[in-house]
């Protein structure tokens, strides 16, 4: 994986033309890429939680799947994107003891919220690598449209 624009938890970035977007440390968090391949523009966000409705006033909206995806879509359209598609990875179950407690299944809930938000916004989810018990690092090449997903102890795959 090459270096590029790095996105941390609750952050987002947009790249036009050539460039790379990457995020590390995706455990239960999800890295979501929205892109317009024809216009060669993409944005990535690293979300931590599924739903902003119970967030404290003034909380960072980029940490929540429901608000982050909608905000990233608006930013990309403002910068010229038209037909957006999505790829995403992450959503692991990082704590074995939490499997029986639904509220602790953050990865699964993050993935469901992301899928639901993408569908509501009319954004096609083209590919995903979700779940499991291992952390991930992802890197999106804006020019080629490839999302490289590196999973701990499992190597790399291209979506």
UniProtKB/Swiss-Prot annotation:
Family, similarity comment: Belongs to the CheD family.
Matches recorded under Pfam families: CheD (PF03975)
Subunit structure: Forms a complex with CheC.
Free-text function comment from the UniProt entry: Deamidates glutamine residues to glutamate on methyl-accepting chemotaxis receptors (MCPs). CheD-mediated MCP deamidation is required for productive communication of the conformational signals of the chemoreceptors to the CheA kinase.
Reactions mediated catalytically: L-glutaminyl-[protein] + H2O = L-glutamyl-[protein] + NH4(+)
Gene source species: Shouchella clausii (strain KSM-K16) (Alkalihalobacillus clausii)
EC number(s) stated in the UniProt entry for this protein: 3.5.1.44
BP GO annotations: chemotaxis
Keyword Cell division among UniProt keywords: no
Record field: transmembrane: none
Biological classification of the source: Bacteria, Bacillati, Bacillota, Bacilli, Bacillales
Alphabetized GO MF terms: protein-glutamine glutaminase activity
Keywords associated with the record: Chemotaxis, Hydrolase
Top enzyme category: hydrolase
Protein name (Swiss-Prot/TrEMBL): Chemoreceptor glutamine deamidase CheD
Signal peptide positions on this chain: none
Keyword Hydrolase in record: yes
